[in-house]
Amino acid sequence: MSTAVSIALAKERKTNEMVLNDQDKIRIAREYFMRADQGRPDIFELFHDDAEIYFPKFGFGFGRESFLEMVKGFEGSLEYIQHDYDSFTFIPSGDYLIVEGTSHGRMCGKSWAGGKTPGGRFCNVFKFRDGRIASVHIHLDPDYTGEDEARFRWGKNRHW
């Protein structure tokens, strides 16, 4: 391929790429949390088809099917989850956006509330490509309701 053709193709690719500013990334991340909380199937419109996901105890997955597989792991136990949008801290950096916050909800008949109970604090690391989410790594303790307390000996008088 000639140099001129290579340059023309590179320019065309660059034109087709959607460059997001920090506010765009924050808007997409907020939309992700709202759609997730509502269980909306159109959440996938925010992701690349080959998007990478990481969730504790699930590990890494790739693509929409992996995202569904991760969500199905909560079937029968997660009654609801609501992220506390006003608690979010956004830290943009290049193609990345880090979102730290809290959630509240109910699982297996027990409630949790981030900042008040052991479970419910999270930190998500999003990577964006071409205007969509290319990866999301979700960092949290999936023991939302504190069922695993016996293995940790810090006592009950902790600040959440």
Model regions: which residues?
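Short, cysteine-centered beta-strand-loop-beta hairpins and adjacent loop/turn segments enriched
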Residues: 77-80, 105-117
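A short, polar/proline- and glycine-enriched secondary-structure boundary/capping micro-motif
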Residues: 109-112, 144-152
